[in-house]
Amino acid sequence: MKRRFSDMVPALLLWAMLSIFLWSLVFNFLTDVPASEKLVLFIDAPLTEETRLAVQLEDVTDEHIQMVQVRSFDYAMMSSHEIENADLYIIGESSIAEYGDWFAPLPEALRTGTLLEGDGQPIGVKVWDAASGKGVAVEVIGYAHPSKVVEDHYLLVGKNSLHVQSHENAVDDEAVNCALVLLK
């Protein structure tokens, strides 16, 4: 019995998708670094040049930080564990309550500008003002993207971050240093 090529297309497509998925897992496994040597920023907005922002932040970190990852929330769908352990977040105001247990109180050094209160203490600092259309890293972050609700965005610190000196088990204060660079 002779098989036609068109009969094999679904199997070939499945093989190609599985191959890409497996190779991406192998690549991530080989190139990833321990959490103590990596700083992660998740942004709940479309990103246009996340690599440029990551390089900009890597330039201000200490030499023991081997990697800065800037990810959109879409990427996090693959690994909810990774997003919950992020060091920094930039999130729209309407989503903050949904992810509220991921955030720590804002360190003193970041308590500048317009602050967002949670449980009686500052948890975020405004990085995008929807009314004025002004904010940080606007050339990289699509705060006012047509697919998003236009709203204020805040920078928040992850409660599981190893890079905030005031946290238990912290190894350094690099998340705060990167946040300060973003806020300039």
Regions found by a protein language model. Give the residues of each.
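N-terminal Lys/Arg-rich, disordered targeting/topogenic segments
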Residues: M1-R4
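Hydrophobic membrane-insertion alpha-helices, especially the h-region
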Residues: S6-F29
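Short domain-boundary/entry signatures in modular proteins, especially
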Residues: F29-E37
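Early extracytoplasmic/lumenal segment of secretory-pathway proteins
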Residues: K38, F42-I96
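Extracytoplasmic/secreted envelope proteins and their assembly/folding machinery
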Residues: E50-A54, F103, V176-A179
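Extracytoplasmic "Venus flytrap"/periplasmic binding protein-like
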Residues: A76-A131
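A structural signal for short loop-to-beta-strand junctions that line the ligand-binding cleft
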Residues: R111-H167
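Surface-exposed amphipathic alpha-helical segments
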Residues: E168-K184
